[in-house]
Amino acid sequence: VNVKERHFDFSRDLTKTLEADDSILEKYLLRRGDCLITLTGSRGKRDYGFVAMVGNQNNYLLNQRVAALRFDQSVALPEFFQYYLASPSYRDMFFGYETGNVGQGNVGIKALLDPYVILPDIDTQKRIIEDVEDRLSVCDSIEQTVDTALQQAEAMRQSILKDAFEGRL
């Protein structure tokens, strides 16, 4: 599964395992609420460090170069950390740990363990999550409006060109 910002991309073929030892499943089976963050990409391009939270996806195993963060949900809500780990300030810090050769960039687990995070109480986390989701919903709506307008502009452009080359202008 490809981890993208706030979602998973299931469009590529997945590696399937028919059988797995119980010890493997215990260690690598993803659970609802796990936050995944990608640790490898192109050096200097920030094309990794993407965060998504496991929801209703079942029977997926953690892959190499992806970290899974699991929280005691009586203290820390995964949704809160999904948004925190995607924030510009965290991403700047995260990429400060980047190593690797000319082409490939890597960030190790130290980037996830070193930072000191001020953790608000659960009610405050819930309010922050709600506020972020409300604002992201507005962004999604604007993005949909822009996409629709671009499609309409392209259709109009094609119509104008058709009319021009059929002598109707």
Positions of PLM-derived features:
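Short, charged beta-turn/beta-strand-edge "cap" motif at the junction between a beta-strand
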Residues: G41-R46
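Amphipathic alpha-helical coiled-coil/heptad-repeat segments
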Residues: D92, D114-L169
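Short, solvent-exposed loop/turn positions at domain surfaces
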Residues: S23-I24, N101, Q144-D147
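Short amphipathic beta-strand starts and helix->beta connectors
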Residues: M53-V54, Y97-N101
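Sequence-specific dsDNA recognition surfaces
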Residues: N2-L36
